[in-house]
Every structure is written in C-alpha cells, then in structure tokens.
C-alpha cells in the first residue's frame, strides 16, 4: 500500500512539472527566430565588430583595413539558385 502511494505522489509530481514546464523552448521557436532576425544585418548592411552579425550565416566581407564591413550574398544567390 505504501509503495502505491509513493508511485502516485511521484506521478502527480511529474505531471505537475510537465504542465509547469515552458511550452516551447526549442531552438526553432518562432519567437526566438524572429528575435534573432531583429539582431542581425541583412544583405549589404554593415556588420562586424561593433555592429550586428549577418543574418542566415551570410559572409561578412571587409575592406583591406578591416572597416566598412558589409554582409554579402552567397555565390549561389548571385546566380539565382537561392541559398
């Protein structure tokens, strides 16, 4: 009888923890993805040290003295193939 009570209490505890857990904390959460986009630079915007990082892991190209850095398109995008 004592074992059944312990199992019941454990089950109720796990159910309560499951209900109280954050509903969608996955890295693909749309709110997190949208927040990341707000913190990144689009194509041909400034990027690099002191600026935002490039969206969609685009390359951040700088001139020879490492200033005037901008986000560039992927090579495949230049030919119209997408990412």
UniProtKB/Swiss-Prot annotation:
Principal location class: secreted
GO CC, one annotated term: extracellular region
Chain residues in the propeptide: 22-37, 78-83
Keyword terms of this UniProt record: Calcium channel impairing toxin, Disulfide bond, Ion channel impairing toxin, Knottin, Neurotoxin, Secreted, Signal, Toxin, Voltage-gated calcium channel impairing toxin
Compartments where located: Secreted
Known role: Antagonist of L-type calcium channels (Cav1/CACNA1). In GH3 neuroendocrinal cell line, it reversibly inhibits the A-type potassium current but does not block other potassium currents or calcium channels. Shows an important acetylcholine-mediated antiarrhythmogenic effect in isolated hearts. In vivo, causes paralysis in the posterior limbs and gradual decreases in movement and aggression during 24 hours at dose levels of 5 ug per mouse.
Similarity section: Belongs to the neurotoxin 02 (plectoxin) family.
Designated name of the protein: Kappa-ctenitoxin-Pn1a
Taxonomic lineage from the root: Eukaryota, Metazoa, Ecdysozoa, Arthropoda, Chelicerata
